[in-house]
């Protein structure tokens, strides 16, 4: 469902597959305008009904000649924000449709983007209330966290003639210069047994002077995070497209200061406006959320006007516009979206941040160049089928709210309303 494809690393995108008509119209429109490769073949179809051989025939390629297969199966099945249906949801099986194309095309590399929950998803999801620590029976093998990715990696490794090694990275787009806090899983596989490394973060501080920053043990200096102001501060739209809040919702949001959320409302208004959600123990940070220009934007959702996932402009009482979405995702300024308003928001909100796609594309391009220089000789030492690396993916801006005021802290539990850079570590956690 992303509508912008890797423009980096010297790749030519020769084919794309998309099910949704409006999304395909967006691709066609930008293709006709010369923003995409002139030889791009567009397949408007469900990937489960598409023959890999048909794709090869249309592009004039043979198995093994494709440098990179990139894609992202629907993520709702694995999202920690959803019901974690995993492969019990038919959409979860699209993971194996993706594997079908890998097996048929035999690309040198593949890149899969998904929600971070994919890395911990179970083949058979058991509700938390029924798990062993709640008195339930021990988990079966297919109920264990991570069983989806283990089986997928195992099946990848068994592909005849070119078993794939896969490196799984949990990253945050904000750490690479995107003006958005967006945690994602990036799966990079190759048929040469090469162990691929993802770059260390380049950004990591909400201050303007990198010279002042010594957060990491090696005292490497990071650039400041890109902020919402960097993304949309100069935007002046004459006729914006906006999926706006209702008058009732605007009444509550008008009481919330920039950078705050439901906690800034009087308690009686919290209860009135949130209903049963007010007594929930988690997942409430998006309720009546008003953004701030001074920090990166939270993760974009497909509908910014929901009460529980509000994306309200910092100073105007309205939802973010479509083009503000596009700026935050760093689409080119001349990019065009097609379809109904809801469909256009879905395209922008579901897309991989352009900057993150470029970083991943550059990583793969460098590996392809290195392998070409050694005549595509595979790595003689065979690594494990897969590994998972967490590259400082969980980022906190250290904001909290009390009695209608917004605070930041240096250490959790410190109630002083003073600003401090977040504590962060450079070391990657490997499993």
Can you say where each PLM-predicted feature lies in the sequence?
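Conserved S-adenosyl-L-methionine
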Residues: 116, 163-175
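S-adenosyl-L-methionine-dependent DNA methyltransferase catalytic core
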Residues: 1-12, 155-161, 180, 184-347, ...
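Core alpha/beta nucleotide-donor-binding catalytic domains of modification enzymes
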Residues: 1-109, 115-139, 157
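Short alpha-helical segments and helix-capping/turn motifs at coil-helix boundaries
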Residues: 53-55, 95-97, 169-174, 283-286
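Short alpha-helix
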Residues: 144-160
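Short catalytic/ligand-binding loop motif for oxyanion handling, primarily in non-cytosolic enzymes
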Residues: 76-80, 118-122, 177-181, 195-197, ...
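A short helix-to-beta-strand connector/capping loop
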Residues: 35-41, 162-164, 194
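Alpha/beta-hydrolase-fold catalytic nucleophile elbow
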Residues: 72, 113, 169, 188
């Amino acid at each position: 469902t992303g509508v912008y494809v890797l423009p980096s690393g010297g790749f030519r995108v020769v084919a794309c597959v998309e099910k949704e008509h409006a999304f395909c119209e967006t691709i066609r429109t930008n293709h006709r305008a010369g923003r995409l490769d002139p030889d791009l073949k567009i397949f408007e179809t469900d990937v489960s009904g598409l023959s890999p051989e048909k794709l090869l025939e249309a592009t004039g390629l043979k198995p093994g000649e494709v440098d990179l297969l990139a894609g992202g199966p629907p993520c709702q099945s694995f999202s920690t924000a959803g019901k974690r249906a995993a492969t019990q949801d038919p959409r979860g099986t699209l993971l194996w449709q993706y594997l079908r194309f890998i097996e048929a095309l035999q690309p040198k590399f593949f890149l899969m983007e998904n929600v971070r929950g994919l890395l911990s998803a179970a083949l058979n999801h058991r509700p938390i209330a029924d798990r062993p620590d709640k008195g339930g029976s021990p988990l079966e093998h297919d109920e264990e966290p991570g069983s989806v990715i283990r089986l997928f990696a195992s099946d990848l490794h068994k592909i005849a003639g070119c078993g794939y090694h896969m490196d799984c990275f949990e990253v945050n787009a904000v750490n690479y210069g995107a003006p958005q806090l967006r945690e994602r899983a990036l799966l990079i596989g190759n048929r040469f047994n090469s162990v691929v490394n993802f770059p260390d973060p380049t950004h990591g501080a909400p201050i303007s002077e990198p010279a002042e920053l010594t957060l990491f043990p090696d005292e490497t200096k990071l650039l400041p995070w890109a902020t919402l102001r960097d993304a949309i501060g100069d935007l002046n739209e004459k006729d914006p497209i906006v999926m706006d809040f209702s008058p009732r919702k605007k009444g509550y949001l008008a009481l919330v200061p920039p950078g705050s959320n439901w906690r800034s409302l009087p308690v009686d208004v919290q209860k009135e406006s949130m209903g049963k959600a007010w007594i929930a123990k988690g997942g409430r940070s998006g309720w009546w959320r008003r953004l701030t220009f001074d920090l990166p934007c939270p993760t974009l959702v497909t509908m910014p006007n929901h009460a529980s996932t509000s994306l309200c402009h910092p100073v105007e009482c309205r939802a973010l516009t479509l083009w503000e979405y596009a700026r935050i995702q760093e689409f080119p300024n001349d990019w065009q979206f097609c379809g109904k308003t809801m469909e256009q928001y879905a395209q922008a909100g579901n897309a991989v941040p352009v900057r993150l796609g470029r970083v991943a594309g550059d990583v793969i391009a460098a590996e392809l160049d290195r392998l070409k220089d050694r005549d595509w000789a595979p790595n003689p030492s065979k690594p494990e089928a897969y590994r998972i690396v967490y590259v400082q993916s969980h980022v906190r801006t250290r904001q909290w709210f009390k009695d209608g005021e917004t605070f930041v802290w240096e250490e959790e539990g410190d109630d002083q309303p003073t600003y401090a850079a977040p504590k962060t570590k450079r070391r990657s956690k490997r499993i």
